[in-house]
């Protein structure tokens, strides 16, 4: 088993870190550079910065936040939000990012994945996939053709890809999309369950496992982390390569080192 990664996620709005529930009700969680330094000291393997308003409000990313962080933190930094062109990739990589995460722009223009991976290398291209369970009312629905159907106690459903910060459904099946981005040259998938986001009830194991098993790419599980036990579960049962978390770290409910020790106790390899 490859070494698993623990990755704090910093959702950034107007230069501050914020956190919400199910992509809504945002509250302030601190300064991105200061938080990055803390997580670096705690032993985080990487950091993810998501400018959560950039795609929707068509705003450029706060390049200076990336620059200031990259000057003080020396673990890999992934940056996403509002990135639409190869030139956007170039600017943010130049500012000090190691990888670029694209979501809305990848759905709107899948060729961007191919283009960016050819220019900067697949290791630089992370495709973020925001997913919501879409429950089926009529099993004869003609739009279900080619979609992967799952069952839960609440009924049958499929996993739908959302864009614009979770504001717009696409009608695209998440498993089909994951396979497509792999073929186009993505180096990694950042997979967020919108249903689990901010709930602290645990990752969506069904979703994570389904995506992890359908591609050879590393999958970062995101959405719902409320404890070290949830991280252990997503590694053991969801086959995730990395676990992303926000609230439990930002509000000091635990720290990276404690999570890693718990993971290690369960015979899962991590960098201590």
Swiss-Prot record:
UniProt record, GO biological process: L-histidine biosynthetic process
Catalytic activity: 5-[(5-phospho-1-deoxy-D-ribulos-1-ylimino)methylamino]-1-(5-phospho-beta-D-ribosyl)imidazole-4-carboxamide + L-glutamine = D-erythro-1-(imidazol-4-yl)glycerol 3-phosphate + 5-amino-1-(5-phospho-beta-D-ribosyl)imidazole-4-carboxamide + L-glutamate + H(+)
Gene3D superfamilies the UniProt entry points to: Aldolase class I (3.20.20.70)
Pfam families recorded: His_biosynth (PF00977)
GO cellular component, as recorded: cytoplasm
Disulfide bonds: none
Active site location: 11, 130
Location relative to the cell: Cytoplasm
Signal peptide region: none
Pathway in which this enzyme or protein is active: Amino-acid biosynthesis; L-histidine biosynthesis; L-histidine from 5-phospho-alpha-D-ribose 1-diphosphate: step 5/9
Enzyme class: lyase
EC number annotated for this UniProt entry: 4.3.2.10
Family (UniProt): Belongs to the HisA/HisF family.
Subunit structure: Heterodimer of HisH and HisF.
The protein's name in its UniProt record: Imidazole glycerol phosphate synthase subunit HisF
Native source organism of the sequence: Methanococcus vannielii (strain ATCC 35089 / DSM 1224 / JCM 13029 / OCM 148 / SB)
């Amino acid at each position: 088993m490859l070494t698993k990664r623990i990755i704090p996620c910093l959702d950034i709005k107007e230069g501050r870190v914020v956190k919400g529930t199910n992509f809504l009700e945002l509250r302030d969680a601190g300064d991105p550079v200061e938080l990055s330094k803390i997580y670096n000291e705690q032993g985080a393997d990487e950091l993810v910065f998501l400018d959560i308003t950039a795609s929707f409000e068509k705003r450029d990313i706060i390049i200076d936040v990336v620059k200031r962080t990259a000057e003080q933190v020396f673990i890999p930094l992934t940056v996403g939000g509002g990135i639409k062109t190869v030139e956007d990739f170039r600017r943010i990589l130049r500012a000090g990012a190691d990888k670029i995460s694209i979501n809305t722009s990848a759905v709107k223009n899948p060729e961007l994945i191919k283009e960016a991976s050819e220019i900067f290398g697949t290791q630089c291209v992370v495709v973020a996939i925001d997913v919501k369970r879409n429950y089926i009312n009529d099993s004869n629905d003609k739009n279900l053709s080619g979609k992967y159907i799952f069952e839960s106690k609440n009924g049958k459903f499929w996993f739908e890809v959302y864009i614009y910060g979770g504001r717009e459904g696409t009608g695209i099946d998440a498993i089909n999309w994951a396979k497509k981005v792999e073929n186009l040259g993505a180096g990694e998938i950042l997979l967020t369950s919108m249903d689990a986001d901010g709930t602290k009830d645990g990752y969506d194991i069904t979703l994570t496992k389904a995506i992890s098993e359908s591609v050879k790419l590393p999958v970062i599980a995101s959405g719902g982390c409320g404890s070290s036990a949830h991280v252990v579960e997503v590694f053991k049962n969801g086959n995730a390569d990395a676990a992303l978390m926000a609230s439990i770290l930002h509000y000091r409910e635990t720290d990276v080192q404690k999570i890693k020790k718990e993971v290690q106790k369960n015979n899962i390899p991590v960098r201590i």
